[in-house]
């Protein structure tokens, strides 16, 4: 691949931001139902109980810490999009929580909450694949498994399961919510992402074709 022009970088970064916003809408829906969230946000929920900050600020601080560690491990993992994910991920969650908090909460009927969790899985998976296909960088929390897998020469799938389990275990011990939403996320998001990946690739290619 040749060197990217400034215009292409801007388009890819904007595409990443759209995907990030979609993905974190899914994360917010998980949390508002109080039926459990994705592994990393179970961890963040637990940490958040120990701080006076919002969930979004705690999320941003943890992503910043991961980036600092990666700077010492191997800075090649960090791209411009990684920093964007760190800076915008938390505030996006806080923004959606403010907008939707009065509409979606744990007082809703369980079947409705389960439907919302299912929708959250699909929304998260679609947004995540847009971020990946933008090829502008990956979220810091996703880089944990990538870095460990490559540095220890272990299969990524196995490492990702161990990392996710560790996030959940530590999060629950700190007071994070583990529930059916976490299980839904574990089984549905990956499958849905596999379906969405070629669709998202076509979307990103179409955007680049129309804007270049």
Q: Which residues does each predicted region cover?
A:
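Core subunits and conserved enzymes of cellular information-processing
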Residues: 1-212
